[in-house]
């Protein structure tokens, strides 16, 4: 037998999931092919048995890649092969990474790489859940010290009922799109967007997803028992109490002093001073990587212990706040003169400059997804320059973190956007993080909402976001509102909630430990709501509702014409529409149903374009009088062609020019002459008969008799 193949199948919601190993990619530490319906993902895990010199963090790399052949397509563009990772690929890579990372032991610094490749796709079944299950199974089979497996589930909420792993069609009707991942004991990660749902429905979805994923976790465990992989013989380094005492002796007091300093830069400088003292005393050129890492680890633990014990003992936090207080807020709108909408949102030492721009339907982003091409009328881009944390750094393409934070802020605002038929603009928000000390993504939600209102977008409600932290030791725990950067790194859970006064629009959770219960999450969500309402009050005081459209934003005018008139508006080879746009300085889009959208920089230009289109599409009415221009004298003295509207000509027969007998048309009419005509008839082919005579008084009978 060439292949030692193992297969495990289980039912997951309405889908059948199959895990296979031993046939493909046998040189990887472990490889699992996951099928869910027709969606197939191949996940391979490779590991490095040696730790690299100087390695002082856990080097886990996750790459989720979509191949266009999976959907039976050939890539577009010049090169005809897959290029840089798409936003969906980056976000899914993060989705796999986040629940897996905390399950590796502390002090484990071996390289681990996970590559998940989508090789077949069913447009109704998203490949992210199979990729997460595949990564979980492959890690268990690789034998590395991984405290998994994890399960992952997508949860929808349709007509008041939770739906496990909804299809794309079901998601379209769902008020919720939530992905949850966790182990058999605890939830580790949540990523979601919702249409303004109450906290208890959100928490219910998390608990429901965690219950349902146990099927997948059990299946992976059974699969591993069958394959029976060889486990790594890796032991966590034992704590060297003597070394801990040395580090504490050198730096303990300085660390305590540092965490009493409320200003971030000064606090960081004090901590650097403490670390330098430790380095000088204990690390020499001869110290190997393992020993240096041990000292770094002890130092980090000391930092964490100081902050955590202060908070759990009920002492004030690093910056002097209690656990429930939001840092001071400052809100300014319309801060940039030529932009369509702008806001500067400052919360303590975190600040976002958010700018909204309005465009036309031509500005929509075209997304070429595996499941099919679609357009997006709302974009939110998040930028995190190095100066926001007072550092020197490289400016370049957005990093994975920036893509992830931008997507979270976007998901928070989607639920309150006006319907396209009520507001046909394309919207782009850019959030420039100008200062950062904790939860800049939530500052982007608040700033983004304010900038859209400043641009005149009729949002259904104000949206605010808040980042929460949690510290848990034994049976003591503290939930922290509006966490600082330091609290984020030293805490056990970081979760972000965005929403309106009515409910939640986005929830993201990352949990680093296994003991967080439903009750703790409930308390945390309630505390987050209190903070959100406080921020919303201040936002509403600053901007009550949508402002007037900026003078610099395009004006959109919509009108509806008969579908059979579309050809006339476009003209031969697009001639008519080009001349209208050139003359009026507007941009015109025509939909197949006859809806015309005119984008203009001024009201006058928009009205002018609208008038031209109305003239082209207008019908000649029988009995109506028009001012027309003679465009042609017909041969053989038949009559003249008179233009009564743009693109609408009619015939004035020789008998309809005057009451007396006309011998020669040229004696009465010249090309270019302006005449008043009355429409006599429009035949079924659209030909128009006109009369000049009908508007002239008939000569008196006596004069006729006298002649």
From Swiss-Prot:
Similarity comment text for this entry: Belongs to the polyribonucleotide nucleotidyltransferase family.
UniProt: Mg(2+) binding residues: 488, 494
Annotated KH domain residues: 554-613
S1 motif domain location: 623-693
Described purpose of this protein according to its UniProt entry: Involved in mRNA degradation. Catalyzes the phosphorolysis of single-stranded polyribonucleotides processively in the 3'- to 5'-direction.
Keywords: Cytoplasm, Magnesium, Metal-binding, Nucleotidyltransferase, RNA-binding, Transferase
SUPFAM superfamilies: Eukaryotic type KH-domain (KH-domain type I), Nucleic acid-binding proteins, Ribonuclease PH domain 2-like, Ribosomal protein S5 domain 2-like
Gene Ontology biological-process annotations: mRNA catabolic process; RNA catabolic process; RNA processing
Lineage, highest ranks first: Bacteria, Pseudomonadati, Pseudomonadota, Betaproteobacteria, Neisseriales
Cofactor(s) required for function per UniProt: Mg(2+)
Other comment: Present in outer membrane vesicle formulations which are used as vaccines in human.
NCBIfam families listed in its UniProt record: polynuc_phos, PRK11824.1
CDD domains associated with the record: KH-I_PNPase, RNase_PH_PNPase_1, RNase_PH_PNPase_2, S1_PNPase
InterPro entries in the cross-refs: ExoRNase_PH_dom1 (IPR001247), ExoRNase_PH_dom2 (IPR015847), ExoRNase_PH_dom2_sf (IPR036345), KH_dom (IPR004087), KH_dom_type_1 (IPR004088), KH_dom_type_1_sf (IPR036612), NA-bd_OB-fold (IPR012340), PNPase (IPR012162)
Protein name per UniProt: Polyribonucleotide nucleotidyltransferase
């Amino acid at each position: 037998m060439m292949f030692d193949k193992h297969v495990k199948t289980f039912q997951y919601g309405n889908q059948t999931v199959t895990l296979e190993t031993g046939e493909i990619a046998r040189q990887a530490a472990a490889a699992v092919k996951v099928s869910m319906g027709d969606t197939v993902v191949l996940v391979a895990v490779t590991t490095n048995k040696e730790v690299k010199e100087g390695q002082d963090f856990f080097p886990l790399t996750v790459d989720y890649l979509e191949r266009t052949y999976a959907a039976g397509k050939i890539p577009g563009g010049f090169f005809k092969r897959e290029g840089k990772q798409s936003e969906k690929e980056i976000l899914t890579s993060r989705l796999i990474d986040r629940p897996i990372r905390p399950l590796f032991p502390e002090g484990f610094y071996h390289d681990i790489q996970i590559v998940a490749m989508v090789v077949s796709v069913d447009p109704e079944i998203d490949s992210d859940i199979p990729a997460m299950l595949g990564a979980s199974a492959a890690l268990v089979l690789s034998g590395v010290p991984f405290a998994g497996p994890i399960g992952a589930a997508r949860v929808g909420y349709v007509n008041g009922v939770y739906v496990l792993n909804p299809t794309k069609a079901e998601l379209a009707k769902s008020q919720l799109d939530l992905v949850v991942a966790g182990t058999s004991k605890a939830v580790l990660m949540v990523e979601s967007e919702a249409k303004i749902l109450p906290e208890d429905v959100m928490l219910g979805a998390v608990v429901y997803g965690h219950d349902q994923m146990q099927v997948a976790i059990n299946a992976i465990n059974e699969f591993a028992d069958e394959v029976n992989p060889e486990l790594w013989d890796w032991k966590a380094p034992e704590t060297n109490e003597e070394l801990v005492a040395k580090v504490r002796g050198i730096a303990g007091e300085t660390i305590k002093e540092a965490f009493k300093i409320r200003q971030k830069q000064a606090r960081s400088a004090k901590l650097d001073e403490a670390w330098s003292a430790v380095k000088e005393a204990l690390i020499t050129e001869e110290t190997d990587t393992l020993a240096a890492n041990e000292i770094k680890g002890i130092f980090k633990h000391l930092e964490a212990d100081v902050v955590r014990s202060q908070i759990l003992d009920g002492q004030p936090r690093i910056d002097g706040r209690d656990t429930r207080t939001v840092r001071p807020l400052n809100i300014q709108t319309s801060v940039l003169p030529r932009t369509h909408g702008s806001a500067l949102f400052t919360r303590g030492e975190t600040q976002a400059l958010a700018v909204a721009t309005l465009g036309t339907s031509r500005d929509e982003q075209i997304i070429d997804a595996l499941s099919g091409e679609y357009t997006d009328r709302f974009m939110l881009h998040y930028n995190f320059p190095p100066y926001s944390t007072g550092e020197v750094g490289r400016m370049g393409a957005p990093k994975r973190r920036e893509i992830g934070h931008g997507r979270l802020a976007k998901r928070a605002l989607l639920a309150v956007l006006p319907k396209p038929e009520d507001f046909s603009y394309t919207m782009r928000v850019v959030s420039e993080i100008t200062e950062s000390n904790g939860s800049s993504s939530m500052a982007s939600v608040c700033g983004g909402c304010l900038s859209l209102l400043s641009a005149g977008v009729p949002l259904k409600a104000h949206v605010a976001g808040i980042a929460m932290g949690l510290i848990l030791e034994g049976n003591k725990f503290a939930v922290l509102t509006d966490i600082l950067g330091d609290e984020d790194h030293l805490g056990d859970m970081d979760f972000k909630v965005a929403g309106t006064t009515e409910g939640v629009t986005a929830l993201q959770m990352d949990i680093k430990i296994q003991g967080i219960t439903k009750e703790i999450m409930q308390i945390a969500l309630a505390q987050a709501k209190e903070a959100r309402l406080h921020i919303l009050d201040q936002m509403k005081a600053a901007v009550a509702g949508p402002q007037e459209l900026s003078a610099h934003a395009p004006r959109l005018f919509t009108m509806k014409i008969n579908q059979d008139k579309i050809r006339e508006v476009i003209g031969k080879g697009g001639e008519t529409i080009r001349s209208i746009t050139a003359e009026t300085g507007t941009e015109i889009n025509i939909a197949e149903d006859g809806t015309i959208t005119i984008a203009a920089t001024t009201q006058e230009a928009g009205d002018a374009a609208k008038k031209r289109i109305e003239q082209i599409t207008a019908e000649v009415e029988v009995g109506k009088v028009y001012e027309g221009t003679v465009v042609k004298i017909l041969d053989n003295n038949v009559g003249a062609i008179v233009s009564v509207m743009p693109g609408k000509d009619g015939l004035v027969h020789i008998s309809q020019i005057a009451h007396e007998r006309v011998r020669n048309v040229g004696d009465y009419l010249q090309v270019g002459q302006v005449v008043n005509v009355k429409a006599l008839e429009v035949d079924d082919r659209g030909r128009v008969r006109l009369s000049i005579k009908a508007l002239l008084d008939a000569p008196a009978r006596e004069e006729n008799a006298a002649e």
